Amino acid sequence: MTSPARRHRERKLAALQGAANPQFDQMRANAYELQLMQLAEHRRTLKGIQSIERKIDAKRTMLPVYTPWIDGLLAADRGGQDDVLVTVMLWTLDTGDLEGAFNMADYVIRHGLSTPDRYERTAATLIAEEVADTGIKLQEAGAGPSYGLLCAYLELLAHCDIFDQVRAKLHKAVGRAALAEGFKEEAAQHYRRALELHDKVGIKKELEVLERELKKEQQPDATGGGS
């Protein structure tokens, strides 16, 4: 566990990245190397764990170590490639904390950060897929993320180049969240968009049921007696 003094120092150094003072540049570079060393150690630990569930549990215990560094980067908002931030964002998504990962995802997309070499896909694609898969998994367990949060991710990634199948899954998750909160028209729109992007996204029957409900609700009450 890091000491309060070290956490404070890491937060200040990260926030000062890109400052004109060469001394701060060197201090920040040294601190970044320490973060990378810590990350490499944690990755070695994770590599020795076979269970996906246990890996996720391990990531939850590791993530707080990086909080001061990440807080400093987000506060400075200066951009620049940072493999620590990108990895921590992906680990946070892995743990299912979509809300906790959003500010990091926003930073990564706005500043055009790349994924480390060990990842074969772009940051935008990885974010979209993690959010969609996690959202759908939580929805099927009856504890899905909020419609507003998923819409925020969808908007963040709107102009990014992402595989159609991945974006389709994200629209599927957003549609289900909309439906869960009573926004049927919006849900239908997202379902239709998901099918436009990938017709095997697995939402056809849900859309058919929803469209029947909407049609029924839009019809005048047949039992009504007029005025």
Each predicted region: which residue ranges?
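N-terminal alpha-helical interaction modules that lie
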Residues: 1-82, 106-161, 216, 220-227
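Residue signature of alpha-solenoid helical repeat architecture, marking inter-repeat boundaries
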Residues: 78-79, 122, 163-166, 198, ...
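Residue at a conserved register position within TPR or TPR-like alpha-solenoid repeats
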Residues: 91-92, 135, 171, 178, ...
